[in-house]
Amino acid sequence: AKLLVEYFQKQGYDLTQLQGSVNYDPMGKMMAKGKDLSNFAATAKELVDVLAPLPKYRCICVNAVELNNAGSYISQELGYALAWGNEYLNKLIEAGVPATSAAKRIKFNFGISSNYFLEIAKFRAGRMLWANIVNEYKPECECACKMIAHAETSTFNLTLFDAHVNLLRTQTETMSAALAGVNSITVTPFDKTYKTPDDFSERIARNQQLLLKEECHFNKVVDPAAGSYFIENLTVSIAKQAWDLFLNVEEEGGMLEAVKAGKVQEAVNASNKARHDAVSKRKEVLLGTNQFPNFNEKAGEKNPVEAQCCCSGNSCEKPIATLNFNRAASEFETLRLQTERSGKRPKAFMLTIGNLAMRQARAQFSCNFLACAGYEVIDNLGFPTVEEGVEAAMKAGADIVVICSSDDEYAEYAVPAFKALNGR
């Protein structure tokens, strides 16, 4: 930070007008890496003092995007972020920093999920609740109550297969954050799940938000969602849930104590598990992964890039529990990669017969279901008899034959199909 100030001075910049942040976040590192960094108050105050010549620079960061990337629910992310920010505010004030100065040095970094309207409501609720919290410290200037929020598209819902769908995810996420009035946005490159983003994917990521700014003019409006009953109602609902969580954390000793005890990590990891279960049952849809996969896509040399701990994947003792950053698609991707690299891709043949509407519906479901595991699927228009369907399956070299028909007709076709296959 000191070098930064010296550099700006040498360049002759007007220090009072420069905006940016240093993003010191010890509690975030505690949850991500498992290191005990609880004695951070002195360092935080020193940062504030060093950056005194830069009044518009933020140096303390509430990096709540880590919770989002770990699969937290929206109310959890916001509730813990408020407690997180309040902990930093308390520590700075206890270290002798005035409330106004302390609040003006804190920045929030939120994640953006694919829940479009809920994300708009989250940011609106966050600004309101943070203003209420800071106001309780009686700052000299009301401007200290303003939340500075950066938004970053989530990595939890990004996928390795059909990776270009990630562009659609991040675009709608960016749109929701822009409509919510965040101060700045980072769009995650679509290929981050399987490699270090290159010049192309980074340029596309930049252009995604430039489209919203320069062509849609989203930077020219202030709170366009105001007055919408649906979003206002969501804002109140999320604010209530987040506030209840904030109060619960404060009653138990504050965010630092909750992190040291592993309570925050335990709650977020439980949400991660619940969301993985929802994805496995298709209650939460990931297009191209657990629903409507690209039948012909192969991963090739792609391998998922997963977050590693401070020990670079080696086992180690951690004094503090850590967050689980496994993406929602990770289990499906593991299954599909194992299938693809097993040496033989199972071939599933759809024996469509009988009622036209039902056989098409059953074939579509079966193709999607099996392709999610990386199986090669062969769909068909229909067969007049079971025997013809079985012969076609044998000629195609099928490993699996799926009878696709109506419930009433299954009893009629199942026995002849079993006899025609006869262990073949």
Please provide the spans of the model-predicted regions.
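Intrinsic disorder at enzyme termini
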Residues: N183, N219, D244-P346
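A glycine-rich phosphate-binding loop feature that marks nucleotide/adenosyl-phosphate handling sites
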Residues: N23-M27, V62-N69, K104-S113, A144-F156, ...
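Glycine-rich anion/phosphate-binding loop at the beta-strand->alpha-helix junction
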Residues: G85, N109-P197, S201-A205
